[in-house]
Amino acid sequence: MNYMMTDNEVFKEGLAGVPAAKSRVSHVDGTDGILEYRGIRIEELAKSSSFIEVAYLLIWGKLPTQAEIEEFEYEIRTHRRIKYHIRDMMKCFPETGHPMDALQTSAAALGLFYARRALDDPKYIRAAVVRLLAKIPTMVAAFHMIREGNDPIQPNDKLDYASNFLYMLTEKEPDPFAAKVFDVCLTLHAEHTMNASTFSARVTASTLTDPYAVVASAVGTLAGPLHGGANEEVLNMLEEIGSVENVRPYVEKCLANKQRIMGFGHRVYKVKDPRAIILQDLAEQLFAKMGHDEYYEIAVELEKVVEEYVGQKGIYPNVDFYSGLVYRKLDIPADLFTPLFAIARVAGWLAHWKEQLSVNKIYRPTQIYIGDHNLSYVPMTERVVSVARNEDPNAII
């Protein structure tokens, strides 16, 4: 619903479609299905680049030279380890806690260990970028191991970024093709213009706080079910469907009841999500190499049936539809799917943090007040007693 404020101001719920920044970081054309990072098509980057090179491109605004990428990779490899204080803090977290909550807390805690310096200091910016890219995956893997009752697996400096994360979950070097698929998944999730978590990052950055608080803010936003977690819900849906034979009845039931089919449709893309096209091809290769399972067969049939019914309305699989299948095939627990999103999106958040600093003006929107006016203060003895709720008075809230 829109509410007119003045001749030049319009209120929109959720700021839907309202430009909140000018940016050079990424571009989406939802009509033609185009996603570009710094002007380069995602298809080219997925085919020819690596996640670390893509992170460099997003954050520094250009493709690195051989010397630049080697230095960047070396810096990240040598900063992967986290301080034992962080590990000890994680051991105090409840093992039933969600990994995103653990990640948000741990990311914020990094700011305690690295002195805040001037945000116009290139060395400070470089160090913060390296630390966050290097340590976020380690923190995700460490909390997972700790909640399982195990000691965290130390990073393997011989392995690349994607391979090292998979190694820290199992202490086994991953299959090279599986690691490559995971690396492409990180690239596909690294950035996607202005969304809730990126907006949160830019708002936080605009206050000139430290970059660890910026990333913690974005992680907290991504943790919400309306933003992250869709690929986990796709797996829950596939489990509910149960078999290929149940796909068509399930789709018909959802359409009849106007229920959402997880992993389909996008607020921006009116055609098939270009990231989903890339992931579909990679998933086919991965399952061909490592063996099909029933989830994959159900997903293939589901895509076919959904497109048959509603493809003409521009409802196609999005990136979440296949990413969950890929992560499951890589033996990654489902509740780590959103932390994986965060690992990748740190690159985009840092790019927007750096861009916000270059043109900074603190975000200060306004509101439309819709409450009461001119009410009188009522003394306690004259207030109407509300009906007591049936709650345990001794319960801890």
UniProtKB/Swiss-Prot annotation:
One cellular component term from this protein's GO annotations in UniProt: cytoplasm
PROSITE patterns, sorted: CITRATE_SYNTHASE
Keyword Transit peptide listed: no
Catalytic activity from the UniProt record: oxaloacetate + acetyl-CoA + H2O = citrate + CoA + H(+)
First-level EC class: transferase
Listed pathway(s): Carbohydrate metabolism; tricarboxylic acid cycle; isocitrate from oxaloacetate: step 1/2
Domain of life (superkingdom): Bacteria
Record's keyword annotation contains Transferase: yes
Keywords: Transferase, Tricarboxylic acid cycle
EC number: 2.3.3.16
One GO MF term: citrate (Si)-synthase activity
Family annotation (SUPFAM superfamilies): Citrate synthase
Active-site residues, record numbering mapped to chain: H266, D320
GO BP terms, alphabetized: carbohydrate metabolic process; tricarboxylic acid cycle
NCBIfam families in the record: cit_synth_II (TIGR01800), PRK14036.1 (NF010639)
Other information: Citrate synthase is found in nearly all cells capable of oxidative metabolism.
Similarity comment: family membership: Belongs to the citrate synthase family.
Designated name of the protein: Citrate synthase
Gene: gltA
